[in-house]
Swiss-Prot record:
The name this protein goes by in its record: Zinc finger protein WIP3
Organismal lineage: Eukaryota, Viridiplantae, Streptophyta, Embryophyta, Tracheophyta
Gene Ontology biological process: regulation of DNA-templated transcription
Compartment annotation: Nucleus
Pfam families: C2CH-3rd_BIRD-IDD, zf-C2H2, zf-C2H2_STOP2_3rd
Organism: Arabidopsis thaliana (Mouse-ear cress)
GO terms for cellular component: nucleus
Motif Nuclear localization signal positions after renumbering to this chain: 257-260, 300-303
Cross-referenced InterPro entries: C2CH-3rd_BIRD-IDD (IPR055187), WIP1/2/3/4/5/6 (IPR043584), Znf_C2H2_sf (IPR036236), Znf_C2H2_type (IPR013087)
Cysteines engaged in disulfide bonds, as pairs: none
Amino acid sequence: MNSYETKGLSFESPSFIEWLKPQSSTTSSKSVLYRGKTRDAISRSNHHQSQMNMLERSLFLYQPQEPLNTSIQCLPLLNKLMENNSQASDIKEENKDDVVTLQIGFPKYHRGSSEDGSDITFDHQKKPIKREIIEDGVVMMKKRRKMKFDEEIIDSDVEVCGKRFWIPSPAQIHVGPMQFACSICSKTFNRYNNMQMHMWGHGSEFRKGADSLKGTIQPAAILRLPCYCCAEGCKNNINHPRSKPLKDFRTLQTHYKRKHGSKPFSCGKCGKALAVKGDWRTHEKNCGKLWYCTCGSDFKHKRSLKDHIRSFGSGHSPHPSLLFDGFEEDTECVTTE
């Protein structure tokens, strides 16, 4: 016996083996009932929480809509501002009727009619352009923009961006800008002094001295102006993208005859047709003749041989026969006939 028993106290405790044994059925049933109650409480709380979430979602998604017929009412200050804006827009719409539309770019020109003889007008202004009539009857016209020229106004002298030029018609190119007619035989001349010299042949009464050959009407001023070609598609036409005017009227005449005119002159040796009489004479003079170099090359023109020698330098020189005759003095070249 231990000390507890000696003192009259007793404590019964289960042994270690009994403690290891499984509990009775009563305790197990109690634990099962407790677990079932906790599960029911948890399920009830979850169901209640889901109902609350559904209610919150419905309240959040529900937005009251106003009927379509309701009108928006602004504050008094906003009403005043809106009235002022409406008045300003009305004023602007009234002013729009008085605004003149402007055309940006180069103005276009077309043929018109007016009392003072000027027949060129703007498309958007319909105002005649002031034009000067010079003494020889050629109409002068001043403009500041690049224009498209019709066939009817090709014979006008124009000033564009400070540069004056002239576009003669085909008739003026063939016969000259003007003709002088003899009052007796009606023969025409391109130059006034030639007409006066012709008049001397009709009698001594027409011989008024050398001063009479100068004349009072000379188209010298316009003949010195740069000229554009009137032929369509020509590189010297004003409508060409890379157009470039010719030096003067005489140069234009030669250009037109060579490029766009007939070729009445033909070489008697090779039959080549030429338009300018001077070109025909030069061609017949040198046709069939060759200029030889010491390297064996031959050229149809003397200038071509000179260019060949200048380009290749040493080892190239004129043929000995040319040097013997004087190559630098425009001697006759070696013939192939």
